[in-house]
Amino acid sequence: MGEVVLRLEGITKNFGALKANENVSLNLEKGEVLALLGENGAGKTTLMNILFGQYTADAGRVEVFGKTLPPGMASAALDAGVGMVHQHFTLAHNLSVLENVILGTGSLWSWKVRYKQARQQLLELANRYHLKVNPDAKVSSLSVGERQRVEIL
C-alpha cells in the first residue's frame, strides 16, 4: 500500500431533500490516477466542489497529504495543492490570461507581486506542463481550447 495523498471519508451532502452524496469515501495513493464515473446528477461535481472547498459537506472530512482541510475553504485547498478545472469556465473575459491566473490563485500569488515575477511563474508552469499560453491575451479573444489551458493553470 502506497502513500495516501488524498482521502475523502464519509462525505455526505444534501440539498434540501436531495442527497447529492451519501457516505462517500475514497483514497488516492501517490502515483495513482482516479476517475469518477456516473450518470448526470450522480453527485460527481458536488463531490469535487467539496474537495475544492467551494461546498461544505454535511458530514465527513477531506484530507490532503494527511492534513484535514477546513470545510468550505477553497483557499485552504489551494494552499494544500488542490486545483480545480471547472466544468464551466470561470474566467473573467475582460481580463488577460495573467490577470485571471493571479485572480484565481489569490492565496498563492499576492496582487502585490510584480507582474514580471507573476508572468515568469506563469510561463514556467505553462512550459512544465506543455501548455502554450500568451499571458497578455484577453480571455475574450481565446479559443475554447486556450481557455481550458488557462483554467488548468
Where do the protein language model's features map onto the residues?
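Glycine-rich phosphate-binding loops of nucleotide-dependent enzymes
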Residues: 1-153
